[in-house]
């Protein structure tokens, strides 16, 4: 019997190579019965480093693919002043346009994530008819009236996204998000996450909060046993430490 295959996506530049290794190590350690195909868009990383990444991934019965992004694809996309973002944050918009047609579903993960459980449940979530599944932010950016997102709990965090490739492409999510970024740079705070929330308003599957736990979701001043109990059953811990 062949192990289950899950398609993952991660994008980063040379500054996040070490966090990428932390991410995939946590995935392999907690999903030993699963094989992965990791689709990556990486810049600033040399061929030697890519070969080392490939060797590491193959040791865990998995594969990795590298995709190239053209500078013109992200030219003119805004990075807010005094922001810690780089243009690499925009790379994730391009995965559905780049992966082979055999990939029907793709789980995108930011590189500031540690996986502490089985990814099968999130990967097999039913998102038929929707371009994406994501976790709504209820303790950070609850809504964004300036973007036309008034409902509390409607704004989602794009650090974990389960992409339905055919629906995403059919609805031209990437193209519409990029167009928004070009048309309304003055509205952009959380870069492509803002754009995706605009074009996917009322059009995504809300995933369980256990699949994207940020520091803002964790209660403060609990005893150690309280934190242990809170984290029980959680799957993805996302170290998004900038307050929204």
Where are these regions (language model features)?
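Catalytic core and acceptor-binding pocket of nucleotide-sugar-dependent glycosyltransferases
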Residues: 133-139, 153-244
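Short, charged, surface-exposed secondary-structure boundary motifs
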Residues: 76-78, 141-146, 216
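Short, surface-exposed amphipathic charged segments that create phosphate/polyanion-binding patches used
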Residues: 77-87, 147-151, 221-226
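Short internal beta-strands
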Residues: 36-44, 134-135
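N-proximal low-complexity "stem/linker" segments adjacent to membrane-targeting elements
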Residues: 1-29
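A structural signal for isolated positions on well-ordered beta-strands in alpha/beta enzyme cores
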Residues: 7-9, 37-39, 65-67
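GT-A fold catalytic core of metal-dependent nucleotide-sugar glycosyltransferases
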Residues: 68-74, 88-140, 153-155, 162-163
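Active-site-proximal specificity loops/subdomain of glycosyltransferases
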Residues: 48-98
């Amino acid at each position: 019997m062949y192990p289950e295959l899950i398609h993952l996506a991660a994008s980063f530049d040379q500054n996040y190579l070490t966090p990428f290794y932390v991410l995939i190590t946590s995935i392999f350690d907690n999903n030993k019965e699963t094989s992965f195909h990791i689709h990556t868009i990486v810049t600033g990383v040399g061929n030697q480093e890519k070969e080392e990444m490939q060797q590491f991934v193959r040791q865990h019965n998995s594969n990795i693919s590298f995709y190239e992004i053209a500078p013109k694809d992200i030219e003119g996309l805004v990075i807010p002043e005094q922001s810690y973002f780089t243009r690499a944050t925009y790379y994730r918009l391009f995965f559905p346009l780049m992966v082979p047609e055999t990939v029907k579903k793709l789980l995108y993960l930011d590189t500031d994530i540690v996986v502490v459980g089985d990814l099968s449940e999130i990967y097999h979530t039913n998102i038929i008819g929707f371009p994406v599944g994501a976790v709504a932010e209820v303790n950070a950016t609850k809504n964004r009236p300036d973007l036309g997102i008034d409902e509390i709990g409607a704004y989602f965090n794009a650090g974990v996204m389960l992409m339905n490739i055919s629906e995403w492409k059919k609805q031209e999510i990437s193209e519409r998000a990029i167009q928004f970024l070009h048309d309304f740079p003055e509205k952009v705070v959380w870069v492509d996450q803002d754009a995706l929330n605009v074009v996917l308003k009322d059009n995504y599957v809300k995933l369980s909060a256990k699949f994207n736990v940020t520091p803002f979701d964790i209660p403060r001043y609990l005893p150690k046993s309280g934190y242990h109990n809170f984290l029980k059953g959680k799957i993805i811990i996302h170290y998004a430490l900038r307050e929204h």
